[in-house]
Amino acid sequence: MKKVGIVVAALLCVALVCSGFYLAKNHAETHSGENVQLTKVQKIIMRDLENDYPATPREVVKFYNQIITVYYGEDYTDEEFSSLVLQARQVMDKELLENNPETDYKEAVRKDVANYKERSRTIRQTSVCDTNEVLYLTDKNNGDELAYVTASYFVQEKKKFDKTYQKYVLRKDDEGNWKILNYYQIEGSPSEEDDD
């Protein structure tokens, strides 16, 4: 009888160990398949612009607007801020980059963000003009392909709302990518498409 008890106890131990391994493996497989939600900051930082560069001038401005919205409206670490700056600079033309060295650009963004926060300003919505409103030109002097894209920004400052417009000038580079060459504030635009 004693031998039967030992055999039953041994079988019970083996069954418990096997059940434990099965449950642990099943739990790990279940959790490894879960989708991880990325923050807006992480989505921008993780975008591989080498292989997934925006195809049109509008898409470049939309991506840049996502970066701007994150600059002014999200929380991020210093490391994430540096990565955001690198992403923003990847959609800028070499001429714009030369005129705005990385350290100067970073400092200007930091100051502007601090000013926004001090004034309780928030970018509520960004919009980009319709595809048929993008103006394409060729520079007669050097043959550069240019595109002009209008964007609008709906900004809240405390309880006051304001809408501003910017014109982006983009130039096609040697790889065929549209890069932001310049941008400046303008008076209103007749129509836009929401980016949000």
Regions found by a protein language model. Give the residues of each.
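Amphipathic, hydrophobic N-terminal targeting peptides for secretion and organelle import
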Residues: M1-Q42, D195-D196
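Short low-complexity stretches enriched in small and charged residues
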Residues: C18-L23, I44, N99-K106, T122-S127, ...
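Short beta-strand edge/turn micro-motifs at domain boundaries
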Residues: A28-T39, F161-D196
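Core segments of small alpha/beta cavity-forming domains
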Residues: K40-S120
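Hydrophobic core residues within well-ordered beta-strands of beta-rich domains
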Residues: V60, A147, T164-Q166
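A mature extracytoplasmic/lumenal domain signature
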Residues: T103, A151-V155, Y168, N182-Q185
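Surface-exposed, charged secondary-structure patches
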Residues: V109-E157
